[in-house]
Amino acid sequence: MGARASVLSGGELDRWEKIRLRPGGKKKYRLKHIVWASRELERFAVNPGLLESSEGCRQILGQLQPSLKTGSEELTSLYNTVATLYCVHQRIEIKDTKEALEKIEEEQTKSMKKAQQAAADTGNSSQVSQNYPIVQNLQGQMVHQAISPRTLNAWVKVIEEKAFSPEVIPMFSALSEGATPQDLNTMLNTVGGHQAAMQMLKETINEEAAEWDRLHPVHAGPIAPGQMREPRGSDIAGTTSTLQEQIGWMTNNPPIPVGEIYKRWIILGLNKIVRMYSPVSILDIRQGPKEPFRDYVDRFYKTLRAEQATQEVKNWMTETLLVQNANPDCKTILKALGPAATLEEMMTACQGVGGPGHKARVLAEAMSQVTNPATIMMQRGNFRNQRKNVKCFNCGKEGHIARNCRAPRKKGCWKCGKEGHQMKECTERQANFLGKIWPSYKGRPGNFLQSRPEPTAPPEESFRFGEETATPSQKQEQKQEPIDKELYPLTSLRSLFGNDPSSQ
């Protein structure tokens, strides 16, 4: 950390920490951004010590700028950080990153005009190529510098560690900037393993070379003196062309960028290989219930790199699928932010979602909303929200129940008005075992014990002084009663059900 922190002096560090990340934003540059930029440069096999001077920052910008259109968001952030650091070294007054990029663009435009003017003054209208590894020596000749072992080592290390994951493509693009077809073949030949993938890459290159030959047929007739022959597909692939021919095509007027053409073919084949090594579709990337949003975004963009689609389609996937495939907690937050939210705002808003702190906040908000019994009834499914008017059994008034009644307690049953029992023991209008209401005028229902108390007064016959002659039918009934009492005692079924109404 100490070596990286020495990039800026005291006064430069003060100016650095006053620059805003975005126009009108609150966040400003800090020392951690320089540390992050140093680590990213080490990943791309670039010396982080170049950040200590404005000239070193200019060299880094020259290498990163051609990859901005096809690079990832991390590459764009790295370019913006180095551009801002360059302005600090040059003591250029800026307020935010946008102004730094504008200053860089102005300087590049001025330098380009100066180079064109110098070329016009010397009678050479062609622009001087400064792309590595083709450089101009002191005699003005275009010479080739072989690709460095350090670059090859970085490329081999990436293949060994990452195999053919999506980040291999931008790494290859950065390491092969300005390379000739011979340099590109050297990089491909250093790959020892993964021969199946390399065979697929060769097939893709052969297909693209055949397509080039079909679209660019050879012109009939001899070649004019002083002119070079037109490259064929095999010449672009470096199999039938020499290094001097490749340099001549790349520096000719007008130039034929055989190195860039061959590089596009290789990247096209690498995309197919990455697709084979990463069979997961972007549609299958979904956030787990307890997965942090940051890890989900990392998986999403890693899979998005492997998608063979245009930048417009990838932008649509990012705007739509990133929110759609998030878990319910994060999706609620992201929809509340709106469609214009940046990735930084999304990650800040969803930070900590799924953890114990977030669950406690959600529970507290839910409990704070439930403040009255009506809300609880709504949550339990009682959507009628209608309260029945209660009636007191004691006084007969509405608005309260008998438990809270202030009137004197009424004696007897609150249902039938009779004394001797309570309302819960009342049998008035009670259904029998058949589910029918027993009429009150018939006495106790049939499903109750038919307890008939014996009369205490003497029978009517004892008050009569003269005996009346009984009819034969009355005698028969008197004989039948003792028999019934013997056959059907009080505890029998007949005493339970009484006289059967259906037999009467």
Curated annotation (Swiss-Prot):
What residue spans carry the region label Interaction with host CALM1?
8-43
Where do we find the motif Nuclear localization signal here? 26-32
Annotated positions of the Phosphoserine modification: S148
Chain intervals for the UniProt region annotation (Interaction with host PPIA/CYPA and NUP153)? 189-227
Which Pfam families does this one have? Gag_p17 (PF00540), Gag_p24_C (PF19317), Gag_p6 (PF08705), zf-CCHC (PF00098)
Protein's name in the database: Gag polyprotein
Residue span of motif PTAP/PSAP motif: 455-458
Keywords per UniProt = AIDS, Capsid protein, Host cell membrane, Host cytoplasm, Host endosome, Host membrane, Host nucleus, Host-virus interaction, Lipoprotein, Membrane, Metal-binding, Methylation, Myristate, Phosphoprotein, Repeat, RNA-binding, Viral budding, Viral budding via the host ESCRT complexes, Viral nucleoprotein, Viral release from host cell, Virion, Zinc, Zinc-finger
Ranges for the region named Dimerization/Multimerization of capsid protein p24 are 277-363
One GO cellular component term of this record is: host multivesicular body
GO terms of biological process kind: viral budding via host ESCRT complex; viral translational frameshifting
Where is the region Disordered? 106-128, 444-504
Note the site residues: Cleavage.
Answer: Y132, P133, L363, A364, M377, M378, N432, F433, F448, L449
What the entry lists under SMART domains is as follows: ZnF_C2HC (SM00343)
Instruction: List the CCHC-type zinc finger ranges.
Output: 390-407, 411-428
Other notes: HIV-1 lineages are divided in three main groups, M (for Major), O (for Outlier), and N (for New, or Non-M, Non-O). The vast majority of strains found worldwide belong to the group M. Group O seems to be endemic to and largely confined to Cameroon and neighboring countries in West Central Africa, where these viruses represent a small minority of HIV-1 strains. The group N is represented by a limited number of isolates from Cameroonian persons. The group M is further subdivided in 9 clades or subtypes (A to D, F to H, J and K).
Q: Where is this motif: Nuclear export signal?
A: 16-22
Instruction: Tell me the segments the record calls region PPIA/CYPA-binding loop.
Output: 217-225
